């Protein structure tokens, strides 16, 4: 997995260059972006991540529950392994999520994603 805490924490967590290089040592290694990544790893410098996906403060999203439901990362993040530069592949809005829940037969209960003042 690319993200260190995706299965265990509220947030997926952002990897650092050495973790990225575990795969990228042999994948797209001639790409200028991956070369910069390798340099960060070699120099043990933190990566200047730019967050691509955000949900509103009133929405709770659990990567862990989606992983346990066997939802593929690519369902929202696309074919990351084929990208030189990452971009937001899917919207982080209610319509996108509800459409996916309907396709997968997942619950549509409001309290899965929203705190209802209980």
Please annotate each region the language model reported:
Residues 1-118:
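Short sequence/structural segments immediately N-terminal
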């Amino acid at each position: 997995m690319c993200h260190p805490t995706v299965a265990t924490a509220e947030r997926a967590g952002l990897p650092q260059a050495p973790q990225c290089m575990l795969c990228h040592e042999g994948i797209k290694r001639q790409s200028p972006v991956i070369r910069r990544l390798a340099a960060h790893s070699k120099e043990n410098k933190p990566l200047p991540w730019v967050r691509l996906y955000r949900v509103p403060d009133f929405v709770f999203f659990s990567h862990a529950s989606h992983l346990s439901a066997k939802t593929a990362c690519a369902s929202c993040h696309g074919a990351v392994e084929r990208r030189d530069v990452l971009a937001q592949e899917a919207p982080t809005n209610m319509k996108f999520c509800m459409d996916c829940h309907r396709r997968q037969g997942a619950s549509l209960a409001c309290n899965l994603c929203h705190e209802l003042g209980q």
